[in-house]
Amino acid sequence: MKLIIFTGLVLFAIVSLIEVQADNERACLPQYQVCTDAPGNCCSNLVCDCYGRYKSGARRGRNCFCLQKGVIYKREN
């Protein structure tokens, strides 16, 4: 009886560790994907870069995207 309980506890521990590891290995966000709600989820060669949105001089929110590290984007007219 003790062996059955011990085996059950060991199996439960193994399954719990596998689930935790799967949560930690979630897929990263590719380039140009929105990362406003998850700034740390961009792939390793990307950074979550945020920009403020303004309308008539008043701030209306912000947008964040996974972009290449070290690249500067400029607005074209």
From Swiss-Prot:
Residue numbers covered by the propeptide annotation in the UniProt entry: 21-26
Locations listed in the record: Secreted
Membrane-traversing stretches: none
Broad class of where this protein is predominantly found: secreted
This protein's UniProt keywords: Disulfide bond, Secreted, Signal, Toxin
GO CC terms in record: extracellular region
Record family assignment: Belongs to the neurotoxin 19 (CSTX) family. 08 (U8-Lctx) subfamily.
Descriptive protein name: U8-lycotoxin-Ls1h
Annotated organism of origin: Lycosa singoriensis (Wolf spider)
